[in-house]
């Protein structure tokens, strides 16, 4: 394979092939459409050759374009190649693949972007795999970032986007269940695909060759199955996080897990203890905000939560002998997850809202269970879990506050609603109503209509309060500390007490919230 030698002066025209053609940079603008790129990358050449373009060194005026006969003609391919599959690739991806192929290298879109495109989903990002090594990739493109050279990854910047381009590689032995001891570059696409986690993620695609499927990924997509590439025990032994990824993909795609893959998960779930909290958090959140958060129950059945969230197992083992419920605390939690929208804070709240029930549970002489004070216990447990999983402080604040107040039965009366909004927070109160609605829908039908009617009434009054702009917090109180200082009040604890008294008065009577009336109220009541 031929590339421009590294370290040559910028702008020099290099002949790495038999022909070198120079074009203005205008003809290779990075924001060109895929069709324009294809036109600019194929030029008539002597002898009927197909002349393809590739970046070398740019002096701001021109780049060197090389020509070569049909690239990689006659390559031997193994496995399934679906010529009928035609995927729509971004212009930047097409350009990168064309440039690499023009210079004698193999290049394909690979992994999740191929999977999602086949399924008609929009990929989050596009990855490219190539036979070129990182330094060869860097020599071909004017703008790159050294993302992870030791793992073979270079990010190519084009059209305002970045695309990770990674050299075919073979992962060495995994000694810690997280990282390979060493990485070896290879010239074999098959060997590169073989190291990937699941068959649906082990497909490659190029516009010229179509779909390359060596391990039955297309068949598993059609059958809606998550299956490991090769021996599942080996795949999970290489990186235990793949155990969580299997369930997460099942939740996101609505797929089942293949029996042999599921069996390996059950056997190797304890190895998840090797995985960092940050990586577990990422996979857990992706599962929770998927269309199937009820897959939490499968994680329990497979022994995953026993390792990463043992508090969930205790909920699954805690009955609720009360007419308000129809299953264990854990079953109720799973049902509640399904009843709330796909939002990280809301789904985390539903997962954690009853974590305190196993500890709070008491049973009376009639056999009925009670969970007095479980809201506060759940808040403390939720905070402990969120910190253990390294969540950010803002998420912890929101989730723990919603958990703390999830069982707060606000009455549908303006004064009560204003006070509740003040206690919970104006930003979180609408979310609290969603939490309470989901909690109610996941309970038994006992008094359900009555509970939902109360929530509807509170929601209606909250909208009216918001539309009228009524004061529900200190920040919208018409009097400030400066006003009190002007009236002779010294800064200190007493000032805070006065402001709190004035706020309480406004929560009872919103018409008091003017500077004049509040100062008069202070003169009468607080001096």
Each model region followed by its residue ranges:
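Catalytic cores of the polymerase beta-like nucleotidyltransferase superfamily
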Residues: 1-3, 7, 11-13, 22, ...
